[in-house]
């Protein structure tokens, strides 16, 4: 552990009744693979991440539903997606320096995993679940809603990130009655800085390809390319 949990609790402004929950939230599964002697006393954060994902989605959904009372489903979905995307949750994790506190295997450590957006987002969701189990939903609201509110304010100034996947899906469903799918073509680059190449398809027809530092980003880029080729990007 790089830093004491008391420091992290101060950053989070949360006092845990059962600090073992926070330990679990910060324990990546790779750490247990190298610490056979500690497996009886530690569990990975995967179960907490599962619960935290649902809580984050619920609170984001509730917030945008209440904030935009006249908005339709598509508009609400776009706002929620912006709040819960990997990059947004990873930025929250960086704010609390969760990467420095995460328990990782040596191999993951050397690959730069502490700052990997997907790992940071997963860890943040696990911490949310730990707060929920220890303190209840009101404590999670107190912790999470200010982060969401700040993000909403920024997005209202700068505009929503364009969701090309939703745009492509709406068009393909309307024109062809099917849902586009995405297939990974290549994964390249070092472990700590990968680049993914994805293809967007309608049935077996290739619509476009895209690259990105995460699978989600590559899929968005593939959808953008597909819309460009179809002549449908705004």
UniProtKB/Swiss-Prot annotation:
Localization: Cytoplasm
Source taxon at top rank: Bacteria
Catalytically driven reaction(s): Endonucleolytic cleavage to 5'-phosphomonoester
GO molecular function per UniProt: double-stranded RNA binding; metal ion binding; ribonuclease III activity; rRNA binding
Any Pfam family matching the protein: dsrm
Active site: 53, 125
Keyword annotations of the record: Cytoplasm, Endonuclease, Hydrolase, Magnesium, Metal-binding, mRNA processing, Nuclease, RNA-binding, rRNA processing, rRNA-binding, tRNA processing
EC id: 3.1.26.3
InterPro entries registered for this protein in UniProt: dsRBD_dom, RNase_III, RNase_III_dom, RNase_III_sf
Gene Ontology terms: cellular component: cytoplasm
Function: Digests double-stranded RNA. Involved in the processing of primary rRNA transcript to yield the immediate precursors to the large and small rRNAs (23S and 16S). Processes some mRNAs, and tRNAs when they are encoded in the rRNA operon. Processes pre-crRNA and tracrRNA of type II CRISPR loci if present in the organism.
Protein name, UniProt field: Ribonuclease 3
Biological source species: Roseiflexus castenholzii (strain DSM 13941 / HLO8)
Gene coding for it: rnc
